[in-house]
């Protein structure tokens, strides 16, 4: 049973799941809006919102923590300098998930996840 489990496995190993979330979060930060499956979007929401909260502190330790999670200089710079300052006054809820369509190949529900 998966009661109170805490996260979705997404059918991947832990390292693959970590890489997936890292790559999705980099894409979301760079583009502001991406389309993915609903399950991935829900996991990504948690991951990205924690990063934005850390980046909002706007000190060197926050910068290092965000870079450690993303491993992308461009995405880190954009998150710390452009995105996080917009959400300093906001207490969470930095992303929005909008269900879009059912994917033709496997009939899974797709969704847009975007920064609010």
From Swiss-Prot:
A Gene Ontology biological process in which this protein takes part is: translation
**GO MF terms on file?**
structural constituent of ribosome
Q: Which UniProt keywords apply?
A: Ribonucleoprotein, Ribosomal protein
GO CC annotations, alphabetized: cytosolic large ribosomal subunit
Q: Which residue stretches, if any, does this entry annotate as coiled coil? A: none
Q: Which SUPFAM superfamilies match?
A: Prokaryotic ribosomal protein L17
The record's Pfam families line, in alphabetical order, gives: Ribosomal_L17
Checking Gene3D superfamilies in the record gives: Ribosomal protein L17 (3.90.1030.10)
- Keyword Ribosomal protein present in the record's keywords: the answer is yes
- Oligomeric and partner information: Part of the 50S ribosomal subunit. Contacts protein L32.
Give the family per the record: Belongs to the bacterial ribosomal protein bL17 family.
Return the NCBIfam families for the record: L17 (TIGR00059)
Indicate what this protein is called per its UniProt record.
Large ribosomal subunit protein bL17
Protein species of origin? Sulfurimonas denitrificans (strain ATCC 33889 / DSM 1251)
What are the top taxonomic ranks of the organism?
Bacteria, Pseudomonadati, Campylobacterota, Epsilonproteobacteria, Campylobacterales
Q: Which gene encodes it?
A: rplQ
């Amino acid at each position: 049973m998966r009661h109170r489990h805490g996260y979705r496995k997404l059918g991947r190993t832990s390292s693959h799941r970590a890489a997936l979330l890292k790559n999705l979060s980099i894409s979301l930060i760079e583009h502001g809006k991406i389309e993915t499956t609903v399950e991935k979007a829900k996991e990504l929401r948690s991951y990205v919102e924690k990063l934005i909260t850390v980046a909002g502190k706007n000190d060197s330790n926050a910068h290092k923590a965000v870079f450690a999670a993303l491993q992308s200089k461009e995405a880190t710079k954009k998150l710390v300098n452009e995105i996080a300052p917009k959400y300093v006054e906001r207490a969470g809820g930095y992303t929005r998930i909008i269900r879009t369509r059912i994917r033709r190949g496997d009939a899974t529900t797709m969704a847009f996840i975007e920064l609010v």
